[in-house]
């Protein structure tokens, strides 16, 4: 690669030798993607307003009503945009639309609590309980995630814990 993305990143989130992006620094500003002549870096998705999102959701209201379903916010990570997601969940609740989020639970509880306060159901992904194994698999320990799982239980959320079993890694073998 040419390295332009690393040189231009205002957060210093792009490693100049590997061109990997440090997601903890990246603000998703798009500078790296907009200046990449080879189109090796691209922005996925688009910005929408709360009203635009609710208009899209309302188009499927009959489906939610007939199926007993609702809106599930996944991603990447639903809590990565916690302010917007919290407002979206509040709007869905005000419109009597059932909501669920999918999360790995990584984030400061003070930041993400509002998301948990305003959703009906949580699909909580636990990659590994053991913090060393979790660090090996994901690059981060499990302490914060387990604490947030505990916080979500105390918060009274309806939770489905999901653990992906990867043969040879976290399947107990």
Language-model features: locations:
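Non-ligating segments of multi-cofactor redox enzymes
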Residues: 1-3, 60
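Iron-sulfur cluster-binding cysteine motifs and their immediate structural context
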Residues: 4-21, 31-46
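Conserved AdoMet/S-adenosylmethionine-binding subsite of the radical SAM
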Residues: 51-54, 58-173
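FAD-binding FR-type
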Residues: 24-25, 46-52
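Short Cys/His-rich zinc-binding micro-motifs
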Residues: 1, 25-26
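Conserved active-site region of classical short-chain dehydrogenase/reductase
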Residues: 3, 30, 82, 86
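Intrinsic structural disorder
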Residues: 1, 12-14, 126, 148
């Amino acid at each position: 690669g040419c390295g332009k993305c690393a040189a231009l990143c205002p957060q210093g989130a792009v490693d100049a030798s590997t061109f990997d992006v440090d997601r903890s620094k990246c603000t998703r500003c798009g500078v790296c993607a907009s200046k990449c002549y080879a189109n090796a870096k691209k922005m996925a998705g688009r910005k929408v307003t709360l009203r635009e999102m609710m208009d899209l959701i309302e188009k499927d209201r009959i489906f939610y009503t007939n199926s007993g379903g609702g809106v599930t916010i996944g991603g990447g990570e639903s809590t990565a945009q916690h302010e917007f997601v919290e407002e979206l969940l509040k709007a869905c609740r005000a419109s009597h639309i059932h909501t669920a989020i999918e999360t790995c639970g990584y984030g400061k509880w003070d930041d993400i609590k509002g998301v948990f306060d305003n959703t009906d159901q949580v699909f909580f992904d636990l990659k590994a309980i053991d913090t060393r194994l979790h660090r090996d698999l994901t690059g981060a320990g499990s302490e914060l995630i387990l604490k947030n799982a505990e916080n979500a239980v105390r918060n009274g959320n309806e939770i489905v814990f999901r653990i992906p079993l990867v043969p040879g890694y976290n399947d107990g073998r």
